[in-house]
């Protein structure tokens, strides 16, 4: 069993076999828990502070499972980590697959559960090297084991396999991704066209407000807030890269959450191309925030085994929980710094970047004054006036 990872087994009130997996980063004061019911895809039932008794995740399944609603489907909507129509999901499609132009509606059955995750080696250091950061903490450059779970699920009839990864990183950042594989060869059917895979994190009932950013040149990252109502809100980016309107984070939290207060949950798609961030709530269940890569028709087509590229990896979807936006941001900063140990292993001068905010006469005394303060001047800071 991986460190800071626990597994529990039990049964639901209706006798369904349950398996719970609990991931925690005590130093970061965060934990995440999920429950498997039978061979169904898991559901995230906890994301927040560490639990005093992690085995209560089993009881959370019955506590959170929606009751059957009169006049509705036999199973009330309760999204798994990858909701499909097979589990009564009636929101926006999050899994879009086709063969020969015909839509597939897979029902995934879990075939394997493996605990453990791996944080890849850092970008600017040799594997196995260690260092001490500016706070005096000992760090390793990886790869390193982290709390995580890997779930493999299949629809044998449709010829589709999904491998889903969830990891909890040292700074408290959660991340998930999925790999979709075509199991059918050319003799068994057409190639598998992939239209969308959108992952997500569930929200508690208390999360009733959304924060994103919008903007344009000279007014980038302008915050905008709105209630999380029944329906779907999304921020697509189709410029081939994040543009001035891009919302690097989509955050949902208790109404009025700020920088230092209020439980809030953020997601970020780790992708430089077309992508979408979304928040969605149905009448029968709590909200979901998530996102993924935006694909055009025919952009990703998977061949059969041994016939070419037969799998597709989604970008990482990062999730950050915190009491206020500062704690959320700190988890992202911790992760970014861990990727560049040499850059952050010693003190750095302040970077003063006034750019278009100030025009100075080209006098050396300005540069000399900033040099004495340890600042680094960005090119273009001192301009003729």
For the regions a protein language model found, what residue spans apply to each?
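Polysaccharide-binding surfaces and accessory modules of carbohydrate-active proteins
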Residues: 4-11, 18-21, 30-32, 41-285
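Acidic-and-aromatic substrate-binding clefts and catalytic sites of carbohydrate-active enzymes
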Residues: 11, 325, 359-363
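Terminal connector regions
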Residues: 30, 316, 320-349, 356
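Short Pro-Gly-centered flexible turn/kink motifs
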Residues: 27, 103-110, 120-121, 302-322
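Glycine-enriched loop-and-adjacent helix/strand subsegments that border the catalytic/binding cleft
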Residues: 297-303, 310-315, 336-338, 343, ...
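Short acidic, Pro/Gly- and aromatic-enriched capping/linker segments at domain boundaries
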Residues: 2-22, 287-306
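Aromatic-lined carbohydrate-binding/catalytic grooves of carbohydrate-active enzymes
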Residues: 343-385
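Conserved, mostly hydrophobic/aromatic
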Residues: 27, 31, 178, 309, ...
């Amino acid at each position: 069993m991986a460190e800071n990872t626990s597994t529990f087994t039990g049964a639901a009130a209706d006798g369904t076999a349950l398996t719970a997996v609990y991931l925690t980063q005590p130093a970061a004061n965060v934990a995440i828990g999920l429950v498997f019911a039978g061979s169904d895809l898991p559901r995230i039932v906890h994301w927040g502070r560490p639990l005093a008794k992690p085995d209560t995740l089993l009881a959370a399944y019955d506590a959170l499972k929606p009751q059957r609603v009169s006049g509705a489907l036999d199973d009330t909507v309760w999204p798994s980590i990858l909701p499909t129509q097979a589990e009564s999901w009636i929101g926006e499609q999050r899994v879009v697959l086709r063969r020969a132009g015909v839509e597939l509606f897979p029902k995934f059955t879990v075939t394997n559960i493996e605990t453990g995750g791996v944080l890849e080696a850092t970008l600017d250091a040799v594997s196995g090297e260690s260092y001490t950061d500016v706070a005096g903490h000992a760090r390793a450059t990886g790869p390193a084991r982290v709390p995580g779970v890997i779930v493999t699920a299949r629809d044998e009839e449709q010829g589709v396999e999904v491998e889903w990864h969830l990891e909890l990183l040292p700074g408290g950042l959660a991340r998930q991704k999925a790999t979709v594989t075509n199991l059918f060869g050319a003799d068994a059917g057409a190639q598998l066209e992939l239209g969308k895979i959108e992952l997500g994190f569930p929200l508690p009932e208390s999360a009733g407000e959304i924060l994103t950013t919008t903007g344009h040149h000279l007014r980038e990252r302008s915050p905008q807030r709105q209630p999380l109502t029944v329906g779907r809100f999304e921020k697509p980016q189709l410029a081939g890269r994040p543009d001035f309107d891009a919302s690097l984070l989509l955050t949902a939290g208790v109404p009025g959450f700020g920088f230092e207060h209020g439980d809030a949950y953020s997601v970020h798609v780790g992708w430089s191309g077309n992508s979408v961030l979304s928040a969605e709530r149905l009448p029968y269940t709590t909200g979901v925030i998530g996102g993924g890569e935006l694909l055009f028709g025919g952009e990703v087509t998977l061949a059969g085994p041994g016939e070419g590229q037969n799998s597709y990896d989604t970008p990482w979807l990062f999730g950050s929980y915190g009491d206020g936006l500062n704690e959320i941001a700190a988890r992202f900063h911790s992760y970014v710094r861990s990727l560049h140990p040499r850059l952050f292993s010693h003190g750095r001068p302040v970077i003063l970047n006034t750019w278009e905010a100030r025009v100075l006469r080209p006098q050396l005394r300005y540069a000399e004054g900033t040099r004495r303060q340890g600042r680094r001047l960005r090119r273009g800071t001192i301009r003729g006036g």
